[in-house]
Amino acid sequence: MPLTLKEKLKEAQKKGQLKKLIELIIAETGVREDSIEVCSISYQSIIDHVYDLLVLENEVYDTNTQKSNFEKFIDSISGFEYLITYFMTENNIFFLKLPSQTIKESQELFWDSKKIMGNSRNRIFIKEDFSRGFVVLSSEYGIEKAEW
């Protein structure tokens, strides 16, 4: 079934946002474009995987309370490994696989930056095989976190 004009415009907008995001990451970190891979993983598949690991920090809404835990986690990952990382633009969610060394060297960009995270307070950093991960999700009751 052919795409409608509205669907084509939406897809073009999504591709444009993805291109802009990748260009921004390259400009801010110096990582090579061929070191960045777009992942087809879904947000729901990540939630399904970490659901039983999530711990609610009741009445805590500031994700920055987890920043030091993120720093410890990222420092424990070999610089030669890749992590799937969550990004949110104006109206799209993307998962990009990046060298962990790039994230280590630009922790502020990947944790705090409104440039690449939009208004999202969620943070997701996982290995492709789900053997290790660090997830902070914002909910109506507080933040939910998981590290494994």
Can you say where each PLM-predicted feature lies in the sequence?
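Structured alpha/beta or helical-core interaction and ligand-binding surfaces enriched in interleaved
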Residues: 1-141, 147-148
